[in-house]
């Protein structure tokens, strides 16, 4: 029955499926400023009004000056403001209190991140793994893509260790998506391959 199957899945002596850690790719909309507070907002805030204002300012400035430079400057200023939420200080720290939604446990604890996704995206991959491994052997790893990959590698290592501890297996499989491959290479470089059964890029 289902209970017996779940118990079997947790028993490494009878379970042949290594837990899977899915290292997602870069997520432009996945970073939040002041997450969990009343001031929470996405680090990337597009506003059509700001875009139209920039175009008006740039075009009118170029016409008035009979020079294209005012238009280019308006575009540069607009881009700087649009991407300001991603800004980092010279010391490598974030300019703002930026964080990403994290899912430290297995996918069985977060059905909302995969149950209704049927695609080739990371969440679709998570669903495929959760339904076939099952969910208690599936981990979706998210990260702040602005950070040094070797710093992100430490968090990947923690996720790998958690997957091993919770599943009872001695190794994991790592599936990478896009920029997640860079982060995974940093993990393998820093921590080695001893806890990895296979890695799919």
Residue ranges of each PLM-predicted region?
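N-terminal non-catalytic accessory region
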Residues: 1-175, 179-201
């Amino acid at each position: 029955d289902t209970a017996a199957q779940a118990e079997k899945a947790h028993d490494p002596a009878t379970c042949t499926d290594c837990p899977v850690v899915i290292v997602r790719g870069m997520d432009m909309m996945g970073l939040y400023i002041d997450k969990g507070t009343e001031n929470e907002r996405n680090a990337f805030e597009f506003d059509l009004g700001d875009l139209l204002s920039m175009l008006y300012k740039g075009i009118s400035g170029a016409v008035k000056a009979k020079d294209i430079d005012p238009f280019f400057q308006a575009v540069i200023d607009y881009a700087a403001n649009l991407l300001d939420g991603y800004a980092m200080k010279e010391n490598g720290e974030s300019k703002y209190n930026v964080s990403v939604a994290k899912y430290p446990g297995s996918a069985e604890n977060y059905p909302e991140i995969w149950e209704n996704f049927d695609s080739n995206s990371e969440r679709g991959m998570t669903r495929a793994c959760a339904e076939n491994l099952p969910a208690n052997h599936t981990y979706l790893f998210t990260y702040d893509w602005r950070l040094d990959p070797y710093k992100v590698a430490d968090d990947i290592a923690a996720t790998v260790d958690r997957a091993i501890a919770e599943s009872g297996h001695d190794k994991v499989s790592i599936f990478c998506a896009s920029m997640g491959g860079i982060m995974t290479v940093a993990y393998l470089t820093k921590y080695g391959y001893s806890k990895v059964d296979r890695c799919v890029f």
